[in-house]
């Protein structure tokens, strides 16, 4: 998909990645910005600031692309991830519910003007 971008961090081998898309509308409020779909670190690679570096690299790319917002959804069941994103300057906007045939999950929508 040409609208999705990937960033792979290496030090010297792969330590993690981010998947993000520009010009994505935050549901219900009309703001448009870069949606950070995923930020993932390999097992054993947390605690070395790799996540911060990957996050800030995505933020820099979004600014360079002319975006005004960086936003994401994080599972309510993952408070450590929410704390990480809040340390990066993200703020809680609202909650939404994800429904599938087999589950229902609360998602926190976090955003940051950039």
Regions found by a protein language model. Give the residues of each.
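Acetyl-CoA-dependent GNAT
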Residues: 1-44, 52-57, 61, 95-98, ...
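Short coil/turn segments at alpha/beta junctions that flank glycine-rich nucleotide-binding fingerprints
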Residues: 48, 65-68
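C-terminal "cap" of GNAT-fold acetyltransferases
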Residues: 30-34, 68-82, 86-114
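Short, solvent-exposed loop/helix junctions and linker helices
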Residues: 48-49, 104
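Active-site acidic-Proline motif in GNAT/NAT acetyltransferases
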Residues: 42-44, 48, 76-77
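Short polybasic/polar patches that bind polyanions
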Residues: 46, 63, 86
């Amino acid at each position: 998909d040409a609208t999705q971008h990937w960033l792979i961090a290496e030090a010297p081998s792969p330590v993690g990645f981010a998947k993000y898309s520009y010009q994505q509308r935050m549901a219900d409020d009309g703001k448009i910005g870069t949606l950070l779909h995923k930020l993932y670190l390999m097992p054993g690679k947390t605690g070395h600031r790799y996540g911060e570096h990957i996050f800030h690299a995505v933020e820099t790319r979004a600014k360079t692309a002319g975006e005004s917002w960086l936003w994401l959804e994080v599972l309510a069941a993952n408070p450590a991830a929410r704390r990480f994103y809040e340390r990066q300057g993200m703020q809680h906007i609202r909650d939404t519910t994800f429904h599938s045939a087999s589950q229902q999950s609360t998602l926190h929508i976090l955003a940051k003007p950039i």
